[in-house]
């Protein structure tokens, strides 16, 4: 049970810290943190939680990561469903806390503001198409899993995995926020989309399918380049 609670709290922190920075601080007058700040916030949530709960649950915080680690031979199949449930619950609770905070500002409307939801077409920050969004999410998640599997390999330098993984997630956001608002994480997408409803839930399917496909490809890619299916 401890590891499931760890995943719940960890994903809560990722969604609250990452999406919270986007909703509350990104465009704050005069001192808004912007795209760079939001990207760093997402990376920092993973970095801090990796040190906090990595020894308890492995600090997946992401259904795609859980599935990718299973595909890479690093995780048991029987744990996939409870891990994903814990992650989604943590993300949804964080979305609720963030919604409560954001609602305290006069004129706030989750649907029109987007509430840090992921989207494509007219709901892409840069107006990118469904195809662009699909390719972006698949490739970004593939590379994320490649870094995770490599950084946590027993042959890799020890103790640096949280830094490599956190910086990788930061870089992913720097690249892809303009395209999809960056998901690479179905729990992150679900955690805020449910409070927007409308277009956000209608487009949510992509942000489950693409990251999971990307994670599977990342696991295959790492097996190809690592020369071993084992740690």
Curated annotation (Swiss-Prot):
InterPro entries: Aquaporin-like (IPR023271), Aquaporin_transptr (IPR034294), Aquaporin_Z (IPR023743), MIP (IPR000425), MIP_CS (IPR022357). The keyword Nucleotide-binding does not apply. Gene3D superfamilies: Glycerol uptake facilitator protein. GO terms for cellular component: plasma membrane. Keywords: Cell inner membrane, Cell membrane, Membrane, Repeat, Transmembrane, Transmembrane helix, Transport. It is found in: Cell inner membrane. The keyword Lyase does not apply. A motif (NPA 2) lies at residues 185-187. Its main location: membrane. The record marks 42, 173, 182, 188 as: Selectivity filter. Disulfide bonds: none annotated. It comes from the Bacteria. A motif (NPA 1) lies at residues 62-64. One of its GO terms (molecular function) is water channel activity. The record marks 19 as: Involved in tetramerization or stability of the tetramer. It is a multi-pass membrane protein. It catalyses: H2O(in) = H2O(out). The chain crosses the membrane at residues 8-28, 33-53, 80-100, 130-150, 159-179, 205-225. Signal peptide: none annotated. Homotetramer. Channel that permits osmotically driven movement of water in both directions. It is involved in the osmoregulation and in the maintenance of cell turgor during volume expansion in rapidly growing cells. It mediates rapid entry or exit of water in response to abrupt changes in osmolarity. Belongs to the MIP/aquaporin (TC 1.A.8) family. Aquaporins contain two tandem repeats each containing three membrane-spanning domains and a pore-forming loop with the signature motif Asn-Pro-Ala (NPA). This is Aquaporin Z.
């Amino acid at each position: 049970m401890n590891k499931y609670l760890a995943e719940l709290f960890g994903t809560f922190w990722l969604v609250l810290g990452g999406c919270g920075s986007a909703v509350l601080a990104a465009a704050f007058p005069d001192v808004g943190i912007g795209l760079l700040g939001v990207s760093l916030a997402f990376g920092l949530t993973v970095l801090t939680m990796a040190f906090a709960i990595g020894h308890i649950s492995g600090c997946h915080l992401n259904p795609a990561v859980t599935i990718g680690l299973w595909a890479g031979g690093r995780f048991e199949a029987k744990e996939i469903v409870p891990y994903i449930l814990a992650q989604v619950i943590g993300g949804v609770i964080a979305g609720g806390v963030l919604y409560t905070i954001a609602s305290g500002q006069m004129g706030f409307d989750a649907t029109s503001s987007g509430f840090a939801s992921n989207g494509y077409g007219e709901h892409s920050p840069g107006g990118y198409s469904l195809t662009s969004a699909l390719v972006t999410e698949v490739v970004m998640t593939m590379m994320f899993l490649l870094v995770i599997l490599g950084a946590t390999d027993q042959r890799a330098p020890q103790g640096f995995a949280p830094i490599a993984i956190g910086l990788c997630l930061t870089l992913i956001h720097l690249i892809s926020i303009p395209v999809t608002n960056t998901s690479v994480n179905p729990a992150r997408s679900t955690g805020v989309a449910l409070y927007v409803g409308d277009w956000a839930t209608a487009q949510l399917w992509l942000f489950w399918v693409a990251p999971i496909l990307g994670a599977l490809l990342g696991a295959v890619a790492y097996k190809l380049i690592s020369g071993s299916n084992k740690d």
